[in-house]
Structures are given as C-alpha cells and as structure tokens.
C-alpha cells in the first residue's frame, strides 16, 4: 500500500492525472439483471437511458475483473459508480464510489474535486467481499486546477477506522 500512497502523492504534487480507466457503453439488455439494476430507475426513465458505461478492473488482485457500472448519478465532482464482484456465477454489489476513476494496478484511485481549490484522492480495494477505502488524501490548492498545493491531509485506514 505504501507504493500506491506514494504514487497518489506524486500525482497530487505534480498536478498530472494518472491514466483513466477505460469505459465501454453496454446496453442494459446485454448485461446481467443484477448489473442493470444498479442504474437508478427514476433517472433511467427520465433520461430514457437504454445503456450505461461499464468498466472492468481487478480491484482485489485475484485476476478476476470486477465491474464498475455508472449508476446514473453525476455532478461537478464526478459520477457515481456501483462496484460489483462476481461470485458463484452472479454479480453482487460490494460498494459505491463517486468521482473520477483512475488505474492503480489493482485497486481503484478515485479523485473527488470540490470546487476549484480542493480535492480528495481515495484508494479503494476489496476485502472480504466489501469495498474498503484504505486511505484518503485531501488537498487544498492556492490556484485552480491542481496548482500550488497549500496543504495536504492524509488519513490512513486501520482496523478501527481512519488515523491522521
């Protein structure tokens, strides 16, 4: 985990985003029912959506890709994603994230911008069938779009919660 923490810190300090995950548009009728169900039904009806974005990525290092499915939620800080893991031939939702997603080997880096002067970077993995945030880095900037870092706050998750 230290290597990933250092990698995310390098991104934060350099202002250069890591490589985004590849999205693929998949029609709802071509995905398993449990996967299509994560897209908010009211939003789906309002938008008359017939498909959604899907990302495949190994989040736990078992060489079996999990599915990240756009759930219909979006805003200035990114979009909502449901994370599903395959077990016994079916997909099961293990968690949700909101933000901009990036590659990290295995695991998931999520950037959540908040206005022009702040952003939170989080690293997630799957443990015991649940999506777990292992650390968060909150950064305040003096200039917009990730320039001139003013402060960095790092919270690392341990057994009892986050520590500073």
What label would you give each PLM region?
Residues 81-103:
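Extracellular C-terminal loop/segment signatures of secreted glycoproteins
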Residues 3-10, 14-45, 103-164:
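Acidic, small-residue rich beta-repeat scaffolds with periodic aromatic anchors
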Residues 54-62:
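Acidic, divalent-cation-chelating loop motifs in proteins
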Residues 76-82, 117-122:
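Structural motif
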Residues 70, 94-96, 134-136:
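Residue-level detector of high-confidence beta-strand sites
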Residues 64, 71-76, 86, 91:
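Mature extracytoplasmic domains of secretory-pathway proteins
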Residues 61-72, 105-112:
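Acidic/hydrophobic-patterned starts of short beta strands in beta-sheet-rich repeat architectures
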Residues 49-54, 78-79:
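Short coil/loop residues immediately preceding or within conserved phosphate-binding loops
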């Amino acid at each position: 985990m230290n290597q990933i923490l250092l990698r995310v810190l390098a991104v934060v300090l350099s202002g250069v985003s890591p490589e985004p995950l590849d999205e693929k548009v998949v029609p709802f009728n071509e995905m398993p029912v449990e996967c299509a169900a994560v897209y908010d039904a009211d939003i789906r009806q309002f938008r008359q959506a017939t498909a959604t974005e899907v990302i495949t990525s190994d989040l736990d290092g078992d060489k079996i890709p999990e599915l990240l499915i756009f759930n219909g939620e979006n805003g200035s800080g990114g979009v909502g994603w449901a994370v599903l893991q395959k077990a016994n031939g079916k997909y099961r939702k293990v968690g949700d994230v909101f933000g901009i997603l990036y590659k990290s080997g295995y695991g998931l880096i999520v950037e959540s911008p908040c206005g022009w002067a702040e952003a939170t970077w989080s690293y997630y993995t799957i443990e015991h069938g649940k999506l777990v945030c292992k650390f968060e880095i909150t950064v305040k900037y003096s200039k917009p779009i990730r320039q001139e870092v003013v402060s960095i706050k790092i919270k690392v998750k341990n057994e009892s919660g986050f520590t500073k």
